[in-house]
Amino acid sequence: MVQLNQDFIKSIAKDMPAHLSMDDFISYSSKPLRPSIRINTLKISSQDFIALMAPKGWTLEPIPWCQDGFWISLDSDVQLGNTVEHLQGLFYIQEASSMLPPIALFSTKTDKAEHTILDMASAPGSKTTQIAAMMDNSGLLIANEYSSSRVKVLHANVLRMGVSNTALTHFDARVFGEYLYDQFDAILLDAPCSGEGTIRKDPLALNNWGLAENSAIAETQKALLESAFLALKTGGSLVYSTCALSKLENQDVCEHLRSTFPEAVEFESLATLFPDADKACTDEGFLHVWPQIYDSEGFFIAKITKTCDVERQKPEPKRQKNFPFTPISSKVELELRQYFKQTFDIDIPTDDMLMVRDLEYWLFPAGMKTLIGKMRFQRIGVKLADGLKKGFKARHEAIVALAEKSTGYELSQAQAIQYLMGRDIPLVDGGKPQGELIVTYHGSALGVAKHLGSRLKNTLPRDLVRDKIADSDASTTA
């Protein structure tokens, strides 16, 4: 059994609702988490994924608050993260409770196609990619991460999941209220926290728990929430979430925001967000998810509406200069569109921005037009292709983000494994060479290969090549 920090137990006992049992909390904290996944609807429907994986022994139990989330039971010890289906972005390994904040963000049905949304603390990318899927890759999603090493992980997951409507930033998120004041239709602040709710995943999470440290964390959370509120448009929605359990990092932080902007802050009740949500609902309408309620990680979710204008707290910063991208010429645009259509049967979206930098051709979300110059961006949209002396060379990320389902040369599982291990694929009766083409598995793009007649020449980027791939219906590896 996990040995819980006794100072933590004494402190959390004051915050636990009277109808919940500390014995149950300790018991559930000692149990391993049920593994859970979220199906990536940018690439496959949940119905099709379930039908696809059932013959492989995957039993999927619906998570009540996320229609694309499932607890998973397997017939054998499959290494989920090393399966072809995971590497090609058909699903994300995501804890069930962490699917709640994006669901709360979109609890009110709105037209997301025109929305500009901010994910203030994004890495590793589970909620960012969930939001992008819920937006169906439309609109604009700004994904920020303060840690430089975690930005790389975030980008890798955005690429793997086929997300194209996102721009990445690398800032202390306290700057957003200043630089992008009154800019966003919706904001998710999944704030850095003490991690009290993650004990089932990380038995060492509470080893260094201390009230003084948590109080310092709460002050940072308050500053981040104020920044988010200033960056939010009037009438917009803000979700504040943590994987902490104490009121100090949750209710108290939200109450601080209301006391700071009393006329503008309204708490929206989440009591009807999903069946039995009321079991975790507080008097304020927040969801305070304790591990024993839904057999999950601990989590906190609050939804806040900005009901009236709030004055800018600092003068508007000077515009950023020397933006390195320029719009491509109409001639090059036509050639680029023809190349993608004729070679890969891909129609480049017409509403987005086609930009160039040093013979690199990029697709920016249309919503970026109003943000260029206001802030520096780490990476915007999708890199489509590199310019050659004659023609173009498509980039892997463009193919996996823009290719339609079932467009390409379908591989068997054995061939897909060989492809992801960077190997060429021999062909029997391959016919005449066909040049560049998309290779797919389960009808979803894996990448590009060059058809040489007798084999498919592998062009997978070296940083994506894996030494071992797990069989998704057994624990053996190739």
Swiss-Prot record:
The active site is at 243 (nucleophile). GO terms for cellular component: cytoplasm. GO terms for molecular function: RNA binding; rRNA (cytosine-C5-)-methyltransferase activity. Its main location: cytoplasm. Transmembrane segments: none annotated. Keywords: Cytoplasm, Methyltransferase, RNA-binding, rRNA processing, S-adenosyl-L-methionine, Transferase. Gene3D superfamilies: 3.10.450.720, Vaccinia Virus protein VP39. It is found in: Cytoplasm. NCBIfam families: nop2p, PRK11933.1. This is Ribosomal RNA small subunit methyltransferase F. It comes from Shewanella sediminis (strain HAW-EB3).
